[in-house]
Each structure stands twice: as C-alpha cells, then as structure tokens.
Amino acid sequence: MSEEPKEKPAKPAHRKRKGKKSDANASYLRAARAGHLEKALDYIKNGVDVNICNQNGLNALHLASKEGHVEVVSELLQREANVDAATKKGNTALHIASLAGQAEVVKVLVTNGANVNAQSQNGFTPLYMAAQENHLEVVRFLLDNGASQSLATEDGFTPLAVALQQGHDQVVSLLLENDTKGKVRLPALHIAARKDDTKAAALLLQNDTNADVESKSGFTPLHIAAHYGNINVATLLLNRAAAVDFTARNDITPLHVASKRGNANMVKLLLDRGAKIDAKTRDGLTPLHCGARSGHEQVVEMLLDRSAPILSKTKNGLSPLHMATQGDHLNCVQLLLQHNVPVDDVTNDYLTALHVAAHCGHYKVAKVLLDKKASPNAKALNGFTPLHIACKKNRIRVMELLLKHGASIQAVTESGLTPIHVAAFMGHVNIVSQLMHHGASPNTTNVRGETALHMAARSGQAEVVRYLVQDGAQVEAKAKDDQTPLHISARLGKADIVQQLLQQGASPNAATTSGYTPLHLAAREGHEDVAAFLLDHGASLSITTKKGFTPLHVAAKYGKLEVASLLLQKSASPDAAGKSGLTPLHVAAHYDNQKVALLLLDQGASPHAAAKNGYTPLHIAAKKNQMDIATSLLEYGADANAVTRQGIASVHLAAQEGHVDMVSLLLSRNANVNLSNKSGLTPLHLAAQEDRVNVAEVLVNQGAHVDAQTKMGYTPLHVGCHYGNIKIVNFLLQHSAKVNAKTKNGYTALHQAAQQGHTHIINVLLQNNASPNELTVNGNTALAIARRLGYISVVDTLKVVTEEIMTTTTITEKHKMNVPETMNEVLDMSDDEVRKASAPEKLSDGEYISDGEEGDKCTWFKIPKVQEVLVKSEDAITGDTDKYLGPQDLKELGDDSLPAEGYVGFSLGARSASLRSFSSDRSYTLNRSSYARDSMMIEELLVPSKEQHLTFTREFDSDSLRHYSWAADTLDNVNLVSSPVHSGFLVSFMVDARGGSMRGSRHHGMRIIIPPRKCTAPTRITCRLVKRHKLANPPPMVEGEGLASRLVEMGPAGAQFLGPVIVEIPHFGSMRGKERELIVLRSENGETWKEHQFDSKNEDLAELLNGMDEELDSPEELGTKRICRIITKDFPQYFAVVSRIKQESNQIGPEGGILSSTTVPLVQASFPEGALTKRIRVGLQAQPVPEETVKKILGNKATFSPIVTVEPRRRKFHKPITMTIPVPPPSGEGVSNGYKGDATPNLRLLCSITGGTSPAQWEDITGTTPLTFIKDCVSFTTNVSARFWLADCHQVLETVGLASQLYRELICVPYMAKFVVFAKTNDPVESSLRCFCMTDDRVDKTLEQQENFEEVARSKDIEVLEGKPIYVDCYGNLAPLTKGGQQLVFNFYSFKENRLPFSIKIRDTSQEPCGRLSFLKEPKTTKGLPQTAVCNLNITLPAHKKAEKADRRQSFASLALRKRYSYLTEPSMSPQSPCERTDIRMAIVADHLGLSWTELARELNFSVDEINQIRVENPNSLISQSFMLLKKWVTRDGKNATTDALTSVLTKINRIDIVTLLEGPIFDYGNISGTRSFADENNVFHDPVDGHPSFQVELETPMGLYCTPPNPFQQDDHFSDISSIESPFRTPSRLSDGLVPSQGNIEHPTGGPPVVTAEDTSLEDSKMDDSVTVTDPADPLDVDESQLKDLCQSECAQCWASVPGIPNDGRQAEPLRPQTRKVGMSSEQQEKGKSGPDEEVTEDKVKSLFEDIQLEEVEAEEMTEDQGQAMLNRVQRAELAMSSLAGWQNETPSGSLESPAQARRLTGGLLDRLDDSSDQARDSITSYLTGEPGKIEANGNHTAEVIPEAKAKPYFPESQNDIGKQSIKENLKPKTHGCGRTEEPVSPLTAYQKSLEETSKLVIEDAPKPCVPVGMKKMTRTTADGKARLNLQEEEGSTRSEPKQGEGYKVKTKKEIRNVEKKTH
C-alpha cells in the first residue's frame, strides 16, 4: 500500500521536473537504507529534504536505523533529521531500531534525544519491541536510560508480559530485576514473588529449577513472598521444592518474616508445609518472638495454638513476653499470660517484663503485669528495680502504679542508689517531689555516702537542688572523703548551684579528708566565678591541704592565672609556705607556669623564698631548664649563688642535668663557678658524673678548677673514671687534669676505673701517663683491685704495665668499694588531692588519681664512709616524700612505678656510686628496705639522660655501660645483688670441709649455705633454675597450686651431707597475707615427686651457723623478701617451690580430734572417735571467696561461703565427720537471709569429690545432706573427704553453673610480678612501646636493647593472676594506635616472657610526650564505670634520635623481610603463590623471634651443636639465624612441620605474640589451615642455588616466587611489583543471542500480549537486495575465558586421573599442570602489557587460550569426552591461527591431531614448542626468574650447560603447587640495558641431548604424579620494553642473539627444540 507523504518536500533551489524530484527522493531513501552515506549526502546537498518520507511515513532515518547503519544515522541526525519523526503506524526510528535489535543505533538515537518512552498507535514502546524480540542488550540499554516498563499497550500488556509470552527468560529476568518499585535490586524470581506474579515465576522456574535463589543478603523468593503475604507465589514456590525453612543471613526463615509482618495466612501455609515453629535466628528469635514484638495478635495466637515454645529466649535472654511488652502490645501480652508464660521471667541481666514496661513507660501493660502478680521489687543484675527505671526515665504514671502495688521506695542498687538518687541525678523534679511525698528520705546515702543532693550537684541539676534544699535535705551532708555537695559543684564550676548552697548555709570552708576546701577545687579547675562567690561568702584564703597548699598554691600548680589574680586581689599571701616550705612561686616554677610566676613576682612574692631544704624557685627553674622563669627570677633579684642545706646552688643542678644555656645564664649573673656543696662537689664534678662535656666546656671557660677536690679527695677526673664517662675523661685530660691525683684513700683515677672494670678508661689514662704502680692507703695497685674483683680484661691490660709485688691474701678478704660523693637531696612538689571519690567521671580527661597518703615517712640510712642516701620505704611517687615531681602533664603522679624519671628527685643522681658498692661489700650491705632506692639512682641506671646532646658521639653509651659497672637485671625495688666473683656463683662453686656460703649472681636472693664440717670431701655444688616443661614429669599440680619459682636443679644429685645445709630460693608467689603457703616438693630423678619434710627451729639454725659470717633472716623477713628456705641433709635432683591455699594439718588417729582453719576461723572439721582406724595426717583448707570477685563475675545472682577441702581426698571415714562452714553473706536482694532453721530453698551445699590433679566437678548435694544452722554457720556430716561449698542462689537450677564459673576464677594462682615498659621513639609523633609483665625475667631485655628501646618505667611488685588477661589503657598525651573498639591485652604466665608490643602516637606534639599506662584486670567498659587498675605507670617517651650510622646498620635480611611483608600495610600486594606465602610466613615468624630462636630451637629438639652451627653460618643477623632454624625444621620434619606444631611450641616458650600473628589476618590469605605442613605448600627450603654465597642473599629475593621478569625500566623495589591481583584480560562478551534458540514463532495464546510486526521498508521502484546481515562467527580463538578455565580445569582433572603409568611406547606426554599464577608475569606488568606498539593485533586471538588456569584449592570436575574433543579442537585452531600469523612457522601438519587420546600429548607438545622460541624464551628456569629475557644467569663458575638441570629442578612430585619452587633463591634485581656482548658457546648437540634426557627421565619418574611441562613454566611474555607479549616463535636448532637486558654484558644463547612428539623411551 502506498500513500502520498503528508508534507510536500521543500522545493530545490533550481526548479526541476516533478518526476525527477520523486526519483531523487526515492534514490535518497534507498541510499540511506543501503548505507551509502556519500550518495545520501549528495542527494541532501542537491536539495532533497533530510526528513522526506515514503507513502508509509518511513524516512531515511527510519530506514538506516532498521538496517543498522550507524554512520548514516549519526550524519542524518547532525543534519537535523527529526529524531522522533513517526511513521503512519506511529513508530519512531527508536521503535524500528529496537525491534531490529540494532543496539548501536539505539544508543546513537537515545544519545541524540530520542524519546525512550514514545508509544506507537497501539501503545507499543521501544522497550516492548526489544523485549518481544529478545534483544537483551537493547532492553538493558533502554532500561538504563529511563525506559518505563509500566507503560502498557492499549490492551494493557507490558514489556514483561510479551517477554513472558515469548518465553524470553533472560529478558524477563532483566525486566524484573529492574522493576523500579523496589528499593533494592533483587533477582528476577524475587521480584516475581514480590509482585505475586505466578506466571513470571513459573517461566523463571521452568528455565532454572532452583527455587531457592538467594539475594545479596541471602533471602529467597519464599522470604519475599512471606514478607508481602503473597500466598499464590508462595504456594507455587513450595510446590516447586522451595525450602520452607531456608535460612537467610542471620538465620532468618520465611516463617520469621511472615510472623514479623503479621501475614497470618502465610504463617498458616508455611506451618502446614512443615515449617519449624521453633526455628531460631542468630540472635535466638523464634517466630513467636517476631510476632509478639510486632504485636500481631492473630499470628501469636496461631503460633501458641500450634505449641510454639513459650519459654524460648533470645541470645540476651528476652522472652516473647519481653518483646510484646516492649512494643506495648497489650493483647499479645494478655494472650501470652493466658498461655501461662511466667510473668517474672528474666533476661540475662535479670530484667523482667515489668522492668521493660517501666523503661518504655507502657502503663497499661505494666498494670496487666502487676495484676498478674509480677514482682514490683524484682532486681536487675545491677540492682535496679522497675521503680528505679521509671524514676530514671521520668515515667510518672508507671512510678505511681508501682508504688500503689507495693514497690519499695528505699530499694537500693548495687552501688546503693535509691530511686530518689536516680531521679535527682536525672533532674526529674516532679519524680523527686512525688517520691518525697510518698515518704522517700532525701538524706539516704549510697555506698559512697552521697545523698540525692550530692547526685543533683554532680549532674548540675539546679532545679532539683533548689527543691531538695527547700524540703529539708542536709546541705552539709558529707560523702566519702568528707565531700559536701558544695565541693562537687565548686569543682564542676556550677556557679548557680554554688550560690544556692551558700545561701542555704553551706560552709565555704568545709574540708575533705585531704584538706581540700571548695575554694581549692575551684582554683584547681580555674572557675573564677565560683571562686568569687566563695570568697564573697567568707571562704578562707589561708586554709591549707594536708600537704600545706593554699588555694593560691593550687592555682599556681595548674596555671590558673585568672583565679590566682583574684586570690591575690583578695589579699592572699603570695609567700604562703606549704608543708615543706614551698611557696606558690616554687610551685609555678616547677610546673613552668610562667604567667602565674610573673604575676606572683609582680604581687610581691619573694624570689628568695627557700623551702625547708633550702631550694629556691631558681633552683627548680635551673633543674627543669625553664629559661623564661629563671630569667624573670634573676631580674627580680633572685640570688644565683643561693644554696640549699646541703650547699647546692642552682648551677650545680643545671650542670648535672646538662642544661648548657641555663649554666651560661647563671654564670652571666655572677654564679660562682667553683662553688662546692657540703661534701665538696663543684658543678664540674656533677658534669663529670653525668658525662656533660658541653656543660664542662662552659664551666672550664668560666674558670672552673679542673682538679677541684671533694672532702674525700675526689677530683672531676676520678668521678668521670668511676662512672666510665669516656668523653668527659678525655675532655679533662685535654684540659690538663692531674692524672695521678689521689683521694683520701689513696685512690688515683686509675684505681677508680679498675675498681669499676672500665677497660676503655684505663687505656686512655695509661696513654695520658697514669702511673699503674700507685698504691692506695691499703697498699693496693689498680691491678690488685681489678684482680680481686675479677675483671679479666682490666687485669690483662694492667698486668703488662704494673710492677707486681707478690702478697698472699685469703679468699675471704673483701674489697671495700670506694665511691665518690654524690648529691641526694629531693623535694616533693606533689599535692595529694584524693580525687577517686570526687571525680570518677573525670578519669578520661587525663587527670590522674593520686593513690592516697602512702609513704609519708622517709628514712635516712647511714652508710659508713661513703655517702648519705635518701631511701624510702614505700612507693616514692605516691606520697609525701621529699621527692621532686615528674613531667608537668602528669599532675597527679600516683603511679606504681619504681622511681625511674630523671629529674623526679633532686638527688643529683644518687647513682649509688655503682650499686656494686652496696651489694658486694658485706660491711656496707644495707637491710632490704634500704634498697627501695631513691628514684634518681634507678633512673640513672636505666635511662640515658633525656637531654643528652647527640653531637658528641658516645663511644660507650648507657647501654654498654651497664655491662661494666652493674648488673642491670637486678634493678628493681629489691636487694641489688651484683657480687664480686668471689662471693657469688653463676651455676656452680666448689666447697670443702671449711664450708662456705654463696649467693647467686643471676638470681637475687638465691643463696646456698654449707656449714663447716658438713661436706665430706671437696665437692662442686651446682644449682640452676630450669623450666617446668623441660622435665618429662613436672611436679603434679592440684587446682589452685602453682610453681612459685622455677624448678631448682641441684647437683651433685644424691649428695649426702653430715648435717643440715641451707638452700634459699627467691619465689614470686603472692601469699595474700596468711591465705596461702609454700610447700617444697622434691624429686630424686625428675619422675616422681614427694613433699620435702625437714623441720628445724631457728635456734638450731643459729647454732648450725656458729662461726660463719652469715646472718639468717627471720621467717617474717623471708616472707617479706619472698624467699623460700629449704633445709636438707641431701640433695635430690630437683626441688620445686609450690604455692597453695594454706592447709592446717595434724596427725589424727582413732581417738578423733578437731581441725580448725586459721584463715577462716569459723571453718572446722570434727572427727569423732572411731572415724579413723589408724593415725594419719589430715588436712583442712579454707579458701576465702572475696565478695568483690563474686560481684564482678556473677553480679548479685548468688553469694558464696569459703571453699572448704578435707585432705587426703576421696577417703571414706568409718563414722561421719562434722563440717562447719560460715553461711554465705546476705545476697544482693537486700534482705537478710535469716537462716534460723527455716526452709531456705536458696541455700545450696555443693560438693566435689574429685581428687589429685583432676579438675573439680561440682554437684548439688543439698537434697541428700541435712543442714543444721548454728549462729552464722551451717554444719553437716559427711563420710567422705571432699571439697565443700555453700551457695546462696536465687535461681536454684543455675547454682552449679554459677559456682563452676566462679571457681575457675578462684583457682587462678596469684603471683607477684612487675610491669616494665620499654619505649623507642620512631618519629616526632609515633613511638613503639613494649610492655612486659615479668616474674624472674632479666629486665634488660636483650632484644629491646638491640633494637634501641629504652626502659621508661618499672613498677613495684604487683599481684597478678596466672593465665588471666591484663588489659592496657593509655591516658594523657599518648594514644595507642589500635583499631576502633579494640583494647590492648596480653596474658600473664609465670616465668614466661609476657610481652605486649604496640605503637602509640603523641596527641599534642607541643606538649611533653608523657602519659599514663593503666594495667587493668577487666576490659574497659563502655559504661564508663570507674575501674581499679592493678598498676599505673607514668611514662615519658625518650627523645626522638635520628639514627646514627651504627643504628642504621640493619642487616639486609631484616630490610628484605620488612619489605617482603609490606603487603600488611598494602593489602593489594598480598602474595599469591603458595611458595610465596610459606616464605613470607616463615619470614614474619623469623622477624619476630629475635633472641627467642635458641629457645625455639631447643623446643624443636635441635642439639647444641646444630644451634651453634646456625650461629656460625649466620653470624650477623638474628633474623637470618631464625630463618635458617625454621628452614632446617621444615627440611627435617617435612609433613609434620605444620602451623599447629609451630603454634604449640611458640606457646611453650610464651611467644603468644607470634601465635597471635600466626592466627591473625596476616596469615588469612590462601586460608592456610593449621594442619597443612609448610613442606606441603612447597619445598621452599632446598639448598641454595649455585651462586648464592649465603643465606642472606636468599633473603634478599623474596619476589622470586612470583616467577616474574620485572619491567626493565622500573627502578622500584620488586617488593611492590604486585599491585593488583586481577587479570588484565577481560572475558569476551558472550553471544547469548546465538546460544538461545529463537522462540519468535511461538503461537500467541488468545488474550496474550500482541506481537509487533516490523514496518514494511520496501521502497517503490527500488531494486535493493533484502539480504540479512549475518554476524561473523566468533573467532575460533576468541574463547570465553571462563569456559576455557572450566575446560582446562576439567582437563587437568582428567589428566591427573588418567595417568596410572607410562605406556611402553612412550607416547604419553607430561600431563598438564594447573598453574596458580600468570606464568612469568606479574599483574602489574600484565596491566602494562595490555597494549603497546610492539603488540600485534593478532595476539589477542591467542591470549585467551593461554590464560592461566586458576585452580584455587577446589576439586576439578571430571572432563567428558565431548569437552575433551572441544578442547582439542580449540588447540588445533590455535595452532592453525598461530601458524597463520606473520613470522610463525608451524611444525605440525594440519592433519596430525587425530584422536582424543592424543590431546594431552599434543597440548604439552604445543606448549613446549611455544616456549622454545628463540626470540626471548630460555631453557634456563633461572633466567626467566631473574627477569632477563634471553639472558642465562651465570651462577658461580657454571656455564650454560647447567641449564637442563635447572629445568629439572621444579618437578617436585610431593605437592601439587610447586611452580617456581626455588624462586626464593633467585635474584630479582632490576637490570639495566648493557651494550657489551659475551659469547658463551654451547654445543647444540650436547644441549639437545641433555634436555631430551632430562625431560624423558622426568616423564618416566614423575608421570603418575602431577607436574608441569617445562614449556608451560618457562613461557615468558615480556618484550624488551617491558610490554606484555607472548613469545611463541620457533626455529628448529637456530641460534640467535639480540639485545637483552643485563648488567653490562649480553648473552648469546642457543635454543634447542625439544619436540615431545620425537621423544622415545
């Protein structure tokens, strides 16, 4: 049919005839239809209208669109063709293109503004047409560009309907998934389920039988149907086998969903189809919970009728009743209660439904519950009743209801809060008013003594305060520490509350227990307005705290300028003196508050004011190097020469601290440079003592006497020599110091250096003419002193130069140490402001709580002839010591450290003159308490001075000094033992009839005394401490027992003595007063153990030691010093000191008797006459159960009596014995137990009859044992000895469980340990910390010292529990670098190295880098509840030092290892191959082992010789040693070398940190299971390849495993080569249209959607051909990557399955191996290699064929014959395609591939030949590893003839993942282009024969096991410029050389082709 167009086309410029015009129009349309662009354009140029159309309305755009001529369409649109022009049928170009499936045209049209939702005459849209014709891409594009699928045809059919009718399942899926109504993209079947579209669902299920398709969150269509209540689809799905109980994410089933949504019909359907009514989600919700929570009555009723579990609880213990109550669903609550749900059912926190109703304020529900007799006084775990909660949440109606039903108005919580406390704190005046109306007292106190008024003041509730004080609340009520509400509000700065309280008569001068008034607190916090109010109401300016601080002192301390100014205006005394005579100016100077100091000076404060010991503010400023304050003080007339009582001037302090500028300032203000203190010390002496050369220079330049002498005659040179300070010694000698000057005792500097063992100093002195023959007053030369003290190197140096006079001396003579004087004054700046009670909520602000008034007493001990040392008996930092405080930010220095901060004491470094002087010389040995040394002394030993100027390189730094003059491992708050050789032993010593006494050198407190005449002959006594697990049979431990020290191995074992000998062993058990005791076990052979019994009284011992110069401590002293004394007449092989619960024991026989406990006096066991038939030792143990422990673990669920044990266990008595045990304390209910013989169902008697080392098994025996109550005790009878325990528990059934839980905590053995913290500042912001909890470890951790850590804190001994975690928190200016929410934690194990390494950052770099570490038993709670730390340590980080050369000298191994696992910070660089993974895992373990490697070696059963050999082979690097050990272990143990094995051994040596690493995310890649052996993954540890001279080189090549030639132009480290794991090759798009058979001619069912027919595009008079454009068939090589992968995988499986042996004819070639990585290529290079100028287009055709087969630990499928044939065909095509590429010759005749049986052989052959290209591939596996295409690596002296051997190496039959096994040995350094050329001739014949020989040999040996064809392994894809390329060229026997990468030379190689087809066997 033909029509005239509606519009006449515009006339051309030149009129033509009408006939020609219509011809032109038709020709134009024909040209457009045929795609002849030029022709069409010519017509347009000649005047044809671009929009001209034929009689059907078709224009050029329509025609070109239909035929898919994109260029024509684009050009027409550019020439303003109407994009939305419609045909007669209303079709636009977009309709036509969509119908024809012309995707590119559709894109162009839409881009040019075509209306995607245009509708034709019958309402068809482009989307409808594309959907009808199954044009998936077009449908997708239209949907993405706004096409609406809701637009229907006139008959109401949508695109989805037509796609369903036509059966186009992919289009249906696409349309459903893009249904815009849903918020989340869901799979098609889900959408069908949502729309209840059974038809769509049926079609989708027809094509995919799985009805349980999952969405992203794991929901199935049935879940969706359940959600929307779509019964029809649900029925269909269930009929099609949908799982009725399918669990989605969090274990949600469809029944949960339907119940939650209230779809009752759906619930019924699901239950009818067998849904589990009691299914639980991950949180424990059942369908009943879901229905109840949402209040769906009908559903709840249905579920209850079907017996839903009404008692079921969630993870948190919530029942359906709680849920219904929470949602205020009254009807559901009633329903549940009708079904007899317990009304008082509790959650895990003991919350009832009534608590929930009170919380939410649901009045009606609360009423129903109370009517059903819910308990109004039920207590939650924290003691809150519903009334408390109602008061907290301001629910006044519920509150009144509760009171009406008898709720207790005085009920108290755990912390003693009543409802009025809670309401006052929350600020609810109306509730407070109602409570008081109902009789609540406003003056009731909580456990801290606080009333409601305190609470209101604390939370700043002014209205409540007003109401309370008007209604009779006591304004002056005192809480704990005597705090009044006024104190609290003053501290918090609540001026309005302060005003109210003062007006109501509150005393402004009320003081807390530590003497703080409200004014002090306001001053401390800087609240000027509050201070003004207080002063207006008469607050006193002069009241002092216990420390004598006035409010002005406090303001000065905290730098509160405004308050200080106000106080001074109000006439506060600027010179008020505190307890130690400190003025506010002293305090301001100490805390560097310059503005306050200036204010005080302006207001007349005296700069001359001196503290009691004579310190002026200038002394303090000089000590702390506060230049500004010092300058101000001097300007105000401070005397630079003012001295303290000891004669110390400011310049002394500045000199000692090394403050050069301060010294210069003081000297410029006329300070006397030669001023000496009372003992004669000048500033130069102190500079010499501290090695301050820079200060010494200033002093000497200003006229200091170089040879000034102290009273004892010491010159600065003596002092420098004594302390081993080489730099100052050199300086003094350069300035003509007298080298032979003598002290009063006749000591020269040389004597002093010899006494201290400083060889380096001695050498310098001798070079400077020191006389070695000078004698002391006692006639000793330096040599004699050194010899006596056992300094071998010193003796060797001096004996050459000394003239010796022979003398005889007895061995017992002791050397009296000569020590120069030092200064020891300290000054306490602290002000004890007990803030525990007043400010718990301020803990997080970095404000620190002082630990109270400890240690107020100072003791002076006189030490003859040496010096006076200030010694403290208690913790030096917490109390009122004469100490000078720490850094300014640690305002409340109450920590548990041993004093360890440099300036924390004006002790001018009481360095104790080398502690040796006090321990080695008996006449000066102090008693124990004197060793709680002054802080400076300790600090000097531990921490090099913070201000040390680094310009002077210190040849002998403080670390090295330790080894000269003291034993740093004993630096603790205990007796310092570092005896001379003659009085101590390391392991053994000789003794004879004269007897002897020896102290242990390593372990302080160890001593062996052999009295005279007790040893029969000269004997070598040995004594060493050994680890428990070293013994095959360690001593058996009962629960609650633990070793208190290491095992003591004595020798000679079995030695008999003529009388008792004494062995004293230090122990670490905490005795908890008298609660625990020590017993000694002995073992003669290490196999059996028994208790060591030897009683002897003290008098006997004294008599025994008669004539010996030994003193024995009393038992009390032994207890204090924690020493166990063993008295024995013979030596067993081992002693064990065991800590256990104290046991009362006695011999009891048939006559009977009574045993009573001394620990818990009410506990007793009464044995009647005849209970025992013979006399035996019977024991009674009573272990107290601390209430706080019970509360911490169980809350107020239960209370317990002591645990009582009768020993020996499991013994039956002939008559019952009577046990008496005190009743448990009253329970948390707040009601007295009232045990008066009444029925007490809550009181239970528990019993455990297990004995020996078996764990206790508690059972409830209340029912079978009658209990009798006597006063506060319960007695009962028993005829077996066992463990008994009384419990008072509300939930009787839970008693045993709760008891067992508590018991596990109670049996943890307590130890006394110390916390030590090491730090290293990495950069100005970040530092590394290592925290240790040590028992008997050496404190100078060698690893930390080697890594340049400094000790920054050490605690006194603290009680810790075995095996329990210790949580670490950081406050102040330091923040730990942890993931959010994570807490630092490590476990304590006795005698193990408990190390916690972590990093911290400095919050504010402008402030001092100091903070506090708190060690806690519990994790930090989110509730912010106050927690008591077991230990607090204040730390200041060491200064950031730039590493000097020596520090930088890390071994290459270490660097390589660090780089090797840089992927830890760069996850994308995670290693891929198993060899790589194993190597890195080893590397990480090695890097962390440090010095523990030897311990590990011993645990792994390596001999001493093997360990020494590892040391010798790797002398310079700990990491190399560790790595070599692991390598040897894997080689030796093979398959048994598993991660689990390593973990267990590491746990034994207590390297839990490494175990954590092994189990942590670092090792997650590859999901390596613990049972998999390192050897299985690959034999990384074969001997080094030739050419690698040392193990170090192996460590340098971590990337070898990647088999990746690096990019030649890339200079980066190869550690970063792997930036991406993804393959750069993308999967070719699937031609899905070709795969899906067309269903276009299905008959339409009646009433189905109409099918659009295409427009008739035939043109009048046109003779165009109507042939269809046929798409070219897919390129035979363009194989879909995933298909190929599957095929390859299945082929591999087939290969592996079908290689039982080698056929005789040898035709079977190597089986194909799966590879785990892209062969020879890193991903980064692949990415780069995607394109490039060198790449030929045709390479793409072969790319996909050689994609890697990534078989990642999944089983390959069996390959069918068809698949095998398909694969074979692809390979054939690949060969043909390759031979068709230019320059590629094909050796194989095209007809050579005949049968499937040959497939594998030829594939292998093909790969082999592909690899043997002469272009860039190589035979040597080494060369392809080294990343040098074409270059053979010359290894050592070997030539290229080694290649076949190298090729053979990778075949390891043991494992399946062996690619690149030796790659760890290969060198991967980037090479640069070289220009030389080197010939390495190789005989072609030799190489060919060898290669053939090796290959065939391998095939014969290894064929039954999977291995990789050499060719496949060696394929390289790198061109000279690093671009990816496949080298597949082959030239038989040809020799070629071309430019290669190399270091200055090139290699010419011959490539011999091994053709698998030619192999013969």
UniProtKB/Swiss-Prot annotation:
Protein name: Ankyrin-3
Keyword Phosphoprotein: yes
Underlying gene: Ank3
ANK repeat positions: 56-85, 89-118, 122-151, 155-184, 186-213, 217-246, 250-279, 283-312, 316-345, 349-378, 382-411, 415-444, 448-477, 481-510, 514-543, 547-576, 580-609, 613-642, 646-675, 679-708, 712-741, 745-774, 778-807
InterPro entries documented for this protein: Ank3_Death, Ankyrin_rpt, Ankyrin_rpt-contain_sf, Ankyrin_UPA, DEATH-like_dom_sf, Death_dom, Multifunctional_ANK_Repeat, ZU5_dom
Organism: Mus musculus (Mouse)
Induction and repression of expression: Up-regulated by high dietary Mg(2+) levels.
Membrane-spanning residues: none
Annotated stretches, region: Disordered: 1-25, 1606-1678, 1698-1740, 1784-1818, 1844-1884, 1915-1961
Main location: cytoplasm
GO terms, molecular function: cadherin binding; channel activator activity; cytoskeletal protein binding; protein-macromolecule adaptor activity; sodium channel regulator activity; spectrin binding; transmembrane transporter binding
